[in-house]
A protein has these predicted regions:
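The DNA-recognition helices of helix-turn-helix-type DNA-binding domains
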Residues: 29, 40, 54, 58
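Key DNA-contacting residues within the recognition helix of helix-turn-helix
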Residues: 9, 32-35, 44, 52
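DNA major-groove recognition helix of helix-turn-helix/homeodomain DNA-binding modules
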Residues: 46-63
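A short, Lys/Arg-rich alpha-helix, primarily the initiator
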Residues: 1-14, 52
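Residue-level detection of the helix-turn-helix DNA-binding "recognition helix"
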Residues: 13, 27, 38-40
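Short alpha-helical DNA-recognition segment
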Residues: 16-34
Length: 63
């Protein structure tokens, strides 16, 4: 199972993206990204699919 909170932060750091920039990339609000990174909420299935694709393209290990 993917730890989205950890992986989102890892991806942003690898790509030198702010939460705001990452939110724009996904078409969501900045507070949404903050909540995901804090583990307060999980992304929707549609967003998880986008995240998975970004993580794979970045060569990130997902397990």
């Amino acid at each position: 199972m993917i730890n989205y909170a950890q992986k989102i932060k890892e991806y942003r750091e690898r790509k030198f993206l702010t939460q705001e920039e990452f939110a724009k990339l996904l078409g969501v609000s900045t507070p949404c990204v903050t909540r995901w990174e804090n583990g307060k909420y999980e992304p929707t299935m549609q967003v998880k699919k986008k995240l998975y694709q970004l993580f794979v393209e970045a060569g990130m290990q997902l397990n």
